[in-house]
Amino acid sequence: MRALVTGGAGFIGSHLIDRLVARGDHVVVLDNLSSGHLSFIQEHLDNGNATLVQADITQFDEVMGAMKGIDCVYHLAANPDIRLGTRITDTDLKQGTLATYNIVEAMRLNNVGTIAFASSSVVYGEDAPLPTPESHGPCMPISLYGASKQAGEGLISSWVGTFGIQAYIFRFANIIGTRGTHGVIFDFIHKLKKDPSRLEVLGNGLQEKSYMEVGDCADAILHVMSCSNDSLNLYNLGSHDTASVRRIAEIVVETTGCHDASIEYTGGDRGWAGDIPRAMLGIEKMLSTGFDVRYNSEEAIRHTALALIEEIGLNTEMNS
């Protein structure tokens, strides 16, 4: 099997590639390396199990070149900074919606039959019931990132209906873990690295969401694809519970050893424009396939904090 992974040098993509290579696939990594890291996939490049195409998925000709001879696409590339869309408003249009069009059109022209798409819980918006099932609708996202993910789902669904491809759409909870390059835990650790005496938290700390460990996420993708064979397959991927931003701050302060740090809240019920204060995905459909997660939200947070502290070198630097 020849698999194309967009964003493959990134956080989730590199973990997925580890598993694809382990099962014997050859992987073509399509990544512009704007936020990805070669070190995440270097072993696979060195041993010939993966090939890097350093290109931008917003450029159709470059996508076409990478698509030749591919059997299955894992489309994970997107704007990694949700807040950026509030300042540069065409970011998600270009890196999300139009890039997804380039992917599915290049698939059509190269007779590639299957795509797995990384969507997000943010497509549901903030008025959905909790936990939110896949059947909830209409989806009314409140961020430009969420709008681009919903548009990507629509494009893929239309390619299924019009051109007969097979698609797996995965709506992710908040994915965290080793190799993380952004997100609340990453941000908190860097803030404490800069100033161990205080930790600023955006919002009131009561925002509460589901967190899924990245290895669980990658395993869930491949498990669902192995046992679900409809033309269009839609699954929420998440954990059984939630954790608050306040609790995340407490765990990060504890694991970094910055016990004297004061946790200071900026106020308000959301961290930024477009942030959803409370989110929890219904995962009964995922569980019905026989897959379950290894970590609950708090366990995933603690595991991630410890891993990122080591990766960032926080304790070494603070103790030197």
Describe every region a protein language model picked out.
Residues 107, 160, 192, 224-225:
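Hydrophobic pocket-lining residues that define ligand/cofactor binding sites across diverse proteins
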Residues 126-128, 178-180, 184, 285:
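Short beta-loop-alpha junction of Rossmann-like oxidoreductase domains
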Residues 61-64, 71, 83, 90, ...:
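Residues in well-ordered alpha-helical elements
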Residues 1-175:
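N-terminal Rossmann-like NAD(P)+-binding domain of SDR-like oxidoreductases, especially those catalyzing
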Residues 193-320:
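C-terminal substrate-binding subdomain of Rossmann-fold SDR/epimerase-dehydratase oxidoreductases
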Residues 36, 58, 87, 95-98, ...:
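Residue-level signal for the nucleotide or nucleotide-sugar donor/cofactor binding architecture
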Residues 151, 155, 159, 188, ...:
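Hydrophobic alpha-helix immediately C-terminal to the catalytic Tyr-X-X-X-Lys motif of short-chain
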Residues 130-131, 182-191, 252:
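A glycine/serine/threonine-rich, flexible loop-to-helix segment
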